[in-house]
């Protein structure tokens, strides 16, 4: 109704950009007439104009430059990438520049849009960060889109997991830096644990553009980034707890009205908790031969609870995979493995005990921050995604980010077919396999989205039984390494790709296949064995060639004989069909000559895989180069691509005529947004395409959140299990379940944010104090300030101004002063008995300053400059030690404060108040410990060698 009365607010917003869009288009001919050097010269021209503006007017100046700057980027992109920004992409760029979220559908070129505001804001010289969800995408975008920025004279940096601090600092100093959210966050935490200013790698934050913003700011918001150190806990307790739990029986249903159900423990999948019943407690205590699981001297409750969760809530090949005797977490949103990440509070150790793996030591938090509070550190924040509108309220409330929906460049031609719901899971998977086979036979590519590694392997086995060649993209390491290759061919005629949770998200599926990427892979395959060091040559899978007489499309080769027994789906993986055709003899000869030329110039097998990858990527760019080797490499890639293009273009026509990409969803996700992301893979840029979801009444979403209505439906449908069910009531149950889950998780994220906000204020205070110390030229002044404050606190602790001075306990006061400052050993109570409280405070502070000067002269005799080093060392040591303990105390407070709700108290307010008192106490202890340490410090005598 409001839309009818007031008009669509999104349409009104878009209308506001039209005059600026007209201005950009008016610049197009003028900018196009410039030669390359003149176009590059525009960057320094813009910077000169910016330098003339004051800090307060810099934003206005950027806004004034926007039309011409965007026109320059559009022209550079045309020349370097062969891609011209559409008008809707220019609008997307304006939305990002204003610090909003731009919702752009899959395939509308979000990556290209980011080049516009990143160029404009990088002109300030203060740095722009472009954030992606994984290393592969960060690297791809830095190589691909970075060409435009490099062409225009800007420096482009890239942060990758295995970089050294020196490499990181160099890349953060660039005008535009591509990085993943986790690398940025961990670098921030590490910088705030540095003991030397030269160890800091990041500079002050300015402007940040987040790609797939919903994934990072919504999906990842519940998980804090944590840097931890090891602590010792008895490993045998984890093993014993796993043994005990394996004998306990799960209750068939949850207890009601405080009455325990039959069984040893109950599981609440919605809240993700496991609770022992009275019977379970008794049985556990008997098996462990202890009187009380909660005995503080020999606690067991924590170990048993974690073992129960490991048994019931953490599923192998869904939540984690086992690799090289290690339990590796699988990201529930992307389906990727997260090596190096571990669950905290002993949960990971419980999983290792369950899987009978070596148990790693437990960890203690040294530093942590949530993504919510990390990204709020940026003065200006913007983001892009294909699906933001469903979370619009959360973006607005938590991050103060508006969402603007950018129209598509071409109208959508995708058909979303009606859901098919089956009674059982096995019937659903059979139906998925049958539809996949049917669509595959028509020559259309199929993308099947699954929710776990385990489910993807089930479908892979079913397709293997029907001899359907397919590619599997999930968290298993052998598949992750082929991610780009799998996505490159996912749009080919008849291709079947099974992907876990959007694992290839961020990479477009191009109908007919991606000839550009196939050509790069081919050149890489030829050069890899000859140029990469033998110890690094864990060679990528080498695909077999398609024979010249094979038909167009993604069919099976004749040599895959049908009578071969299929033991596992790997037998029919479609890897051999990566390259669309055999190269001509002349092109093969060009590759051979190139190989000899590069061995001669670069050396025989001396490069690392990353170095070779870098050189191939540089050659695949269109940016100008003076290097003859890069030029030869570029010509070879172009030659291979032109041959592949012939077949790929043919396939593209076949695929379009057959109906485009078909996407199958095998389970409704907890969030409608994730379902929309999967659907959005089909029908990019107005292409034809279709989607369908297959569901079963046993799917997690319906089982956990659908409640009794779904249970009633299961009994009501007396149909054959292979017969799909269609029911309005079921559809409504699904939608209602999804909304319930979205609200439930929004509340959790909101709570995480509110509690972390308390920690965030404390974190900022501690980190700014640390930074002051690292940069500190005035450390002496700071330490004396700590001492003066300590003297003031001692005076007020031992002197009551309301009592006459004769009753003051000056003996104890003097004793306490000497505890901190032993150099005041000759101070006597009679020296201060005539002073009032203010005079007493001033006198003690004066004595402290004199004693500190004396201490400094003693220390400096040992080595000039040593006093400043000692000050820095002791302040940082105390901050880090006490902050670490404070984090643990705050965690414990947060665990216990929830119970206060039963006493009609607001847990959050209690947490804020007590947390604040604990923080003040920590800062007081830090000041006192530093003063004590400085006066007690005795440098070691110089050694004889010196």
Curated annotation (Swiss-Prot):
What's this chain's function?
Part of the Sec protein translocase complex. Interacts with the SecYEG preprotein conducting channel. Has a central role in coupling the hydrolysis of ATP to the transfer of proteins into and across the cell membrane, serving as an ATP-driven molecular motor driving the stepwise translocation of polypeptide chains across the membrane. Probably participates in protein translocation into and across both the cytoplasmic and thylakoid membranes in cyanobacterial cells.
Q: Where is this region: Disordered?
A: 534-569
- Signal peptide extent: none
Query: Membrane-crossing residues?
Result: none
Q: Sorted alphabetically, which CDD domains does this protein's record hold?
A: DEXDc_SecA, SF2_C_secA
Q: Where in the cell is it found?
A: Cell inner membrane; Cellular thylakoid membrane; Cytoplasm
Its keywords, alphabetically, are:
ATP-binding, Cell inner membrane, Cell membrane, Cytoplasm, Membrane, Nucleotide-binding, Protein transport, Thylakoid, Translocase, Translocation, Transport
Q: Which GO terms describe its cellular component?
A: cell envelope Sec protein transport complex; cytosol; plasma membrane-derived thylakoid membrane
Q: Where is the composition biased (Basic and acidic residues)?
A: 546-569
Annotated positions binding ATP: 89, 107-111, 508
Q: Which InterPro entries match?
A: Helicase_ATP-bd, P-loop_NTPase, SecA, SecA_CS, SecA_DEAD, SecA_motor_DEAD, SecA_preprotein_X-link_dom, SecA_SF2_C
* Protein name (Swiss-Prot/TrEMBL): Protein translocase subunit SecA
Keyword presence, Cell membrane: yes
Q: Which gene encodes it?
A: secA
Q: How does it sit in the membrane?
A: Peripheral membrane protein
NCBIfam families hit by this protein: secA (TIGR00963)
Question: What pairs make up the disulfide bonds?
Answer: none
- Please report which protein family the annotation says this sequence is part of: Belongs to the SecA family.
Classification via Gene3D superfamilies = Helical scaffold and wing domains of SecA, P-loop containing nucleotide triphosphate hydrolases, SecA, preprotein cross-linking domain
Q: Which HAMAP family match?
A: SecA
- Give the record's subunit note: Monomer and homodimer. Part of the essential Sec protein translocation apparatus which comprises SecA, SecYEG and auxiliary proteins SecDF. Other proteins may also be involved.
Task: Report whether Ion transport shows up as a keyword of the record.
Answer: no
Reactions catalysed: ATP + H2O + cellular proteinSide 1 = ADP + phosphate + cellular proteinSide 2
Q: Name one GO biological process term.
A: protein transport by the Sec complex
**Please, which domain of life does this record's source organism belong to?**
Bacteria
Q: Name one GO molecular function term.
A: ATP binding
């Amino acid at each position: 109704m409001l839309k009818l009365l007031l008009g669509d607010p999104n349409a009104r917003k878009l209308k506001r950009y039209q005059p600026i869009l007209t201005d950009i288009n008016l610049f197009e001919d003028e900018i196009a007439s410039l030669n390359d050097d003149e176009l590059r010269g525009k960057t320094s021209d813009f910077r000169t104009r910016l330098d003339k503006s004051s800090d307060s007017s810099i934003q206005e100046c950027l806004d004034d430059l926007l039309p011409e700057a965007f026109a320059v980027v559009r022209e550079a992109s045309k020349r370097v990438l062969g891609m011209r920004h559409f008008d809707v992409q220019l609008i997307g760029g304006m939305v990002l520049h204003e610090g909003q979220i731009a919702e752009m559908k899959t395939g509308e070129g979000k990556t290209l849009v980011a080049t516009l505001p990143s160029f404009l804001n990088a002109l300030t010289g203060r740095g722009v960060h472009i954030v992606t969800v994984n290393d592969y995408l960060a690297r791809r975008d830095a190589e691909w889109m970075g060409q435009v920025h490099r062409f225009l004279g800007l420096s482009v940096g890239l942060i990758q997991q295995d970089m050294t601090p020196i490499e990181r600092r160099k890349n953060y100093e660039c005008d535009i830096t591509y990085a993943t959210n986790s690398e940025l966050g961990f670098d921030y935490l590490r910088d705030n644990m540095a003991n030397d200013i030269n160890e800091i790698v990041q500079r002050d934050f300015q402007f940040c553009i987040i790609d797939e913003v919903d994934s990072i700011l919504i999906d990842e918001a519940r998980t804090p980034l944590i840097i931890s150190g090891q602590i010792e806990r008895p490993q045998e307790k984890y093993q014993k707890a796993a043994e005990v739990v394996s004998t306990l029986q799960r209750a068939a249903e949850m207890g009601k009205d405080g009455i325990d159900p039959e069984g040893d423990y109950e599981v609440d999948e919605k809240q993700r908790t496991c609770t022992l019943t009275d019977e379970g407690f008794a049985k556990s205590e008997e098996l462990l031969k202890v009187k009380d699981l909660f005995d503080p001297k020999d606690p067991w409750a924590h170990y048993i609870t974690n073992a129960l969760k490991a048994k019931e809530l953490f599923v192998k090949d869904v939540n984690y995979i086992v690799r090289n005797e290690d339990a590796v977490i699988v990201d529930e949103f992307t389906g990727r493995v997260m090596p190096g990440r571990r669950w905290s509070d002993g949960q990971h150790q419980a999983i290792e005990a369950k899987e009978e793996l070596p148990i790693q030591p437990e960890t203690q938090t040294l530093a942590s921050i949530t993504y919510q509070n990390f990204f709020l550190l940026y003065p200006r924040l913007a983001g892009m995604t294909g699906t933001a509108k469903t979370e619009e309220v959360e973006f607005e409330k938590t991050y103060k980010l508006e969402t603007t929906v950018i129209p598509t460049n071409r109208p959508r031609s995708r058909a979303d077919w009606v859901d098919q719901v089956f009674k059982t899971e096995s019937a659903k998977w059979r139906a998925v396999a049958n539809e996949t086979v049917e669509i595959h036979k028509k020559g259309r590519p199929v993308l099947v989205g699954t929710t776990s590694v385990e489910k993807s392997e089930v479908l892979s086995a079913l397709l293997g039984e029907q001899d359907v060649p397919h590619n599997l993209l999930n968290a298993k390491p052998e598949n992750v390494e082929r991610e780009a290759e799998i996505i490159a061919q996912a749009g080919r005629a008849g291709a079947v790709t099974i992907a876990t949770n959007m694992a290839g998200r961020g990479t477009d599926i191009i109908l007919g296949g991606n000839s550009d990427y196939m050509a790069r892979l081919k050149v890489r395959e030829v050069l890899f064995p000859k140029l990469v060091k033998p110890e690094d040559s864990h060679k990528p899978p080498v695909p077999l060639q398609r024979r010249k007489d094979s038909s167009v499309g993604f069919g099976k080769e004749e040599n895959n004989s049908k009578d071969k027994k299929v033991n596992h789906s790997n037998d029919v993986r479609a890897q051999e069909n990566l390259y669309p055709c055999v190269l001509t003899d002349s092109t093969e000869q060009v590759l051979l000559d190139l190989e000899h030329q590069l061995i001669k110039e670069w050396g025989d097998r001396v490069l690392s895989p990353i170095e070779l990858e870098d050189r191939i990527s540089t050659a695949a760019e269109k940016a100008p180069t003076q290097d003859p080797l890069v030029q030869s490499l570029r010509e070879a890639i172009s030659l291979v691509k032109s041959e592949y293009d012939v077949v790929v273009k043919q396939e593209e026509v076949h695929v379009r005529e057959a109906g485009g990409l078909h996407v199958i969803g095998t389970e409704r996700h907890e969030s409608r947004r994730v379902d929309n992301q999967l659907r959005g893979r089909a029908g990019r840029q107005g292409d034809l395409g279709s989607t369908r979801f297959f569901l079963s009444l046993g799917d997690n979403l319906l089982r956990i959140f659908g409640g009794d209505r779904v249970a009633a439906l299961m009994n009501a449908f007396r149909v054959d299990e292979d017969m799909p069910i269609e029911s309005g009531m079921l559809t409504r149950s699904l939608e209602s379940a999804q909304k319930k889950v979205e609200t439930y998780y929004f509340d959790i994220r909101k709570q995480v944010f509110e509690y972390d906000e308390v920690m965030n204020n404390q974190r900022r205070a501690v980190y700014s104090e640390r930074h002051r110390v690292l940069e500190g030229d005035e450390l002496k002044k700071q330490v004396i300030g700590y001492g003066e404050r300590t003297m003031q606190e001692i005076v007020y602790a031992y002197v009551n101004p309301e009592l006459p001075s004769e009753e003051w306990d000056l003996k104890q006061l003097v004793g306490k002063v000497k505890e901190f400052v032993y150099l005041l050993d000759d101070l006597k109570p009679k020296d201060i008995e005539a002073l009032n409280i203010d005079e007493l405070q001033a006198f003690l502070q004066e004595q402290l300053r004199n004693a500190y000067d004396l201490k400094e002269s003693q220390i400096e005799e040992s080595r000039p400059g040593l006093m400043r080093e000692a000050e820095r060392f002791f302040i940082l040591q105390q901050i880090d030690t006490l902050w670490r303990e404070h984090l643990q105390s705050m965690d414990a407070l947060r665990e216990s404060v929830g119970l206060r709700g039963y006493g009609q108290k607001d847990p959050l307010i209690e947490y804020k108040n007590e947390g604040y008192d604990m923080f003040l106490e920590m800062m007081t202890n830090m000041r006192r410990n530093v003063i004590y340490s400085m006066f007690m410090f005795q440098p070691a005598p110089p050694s004889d060698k010196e």
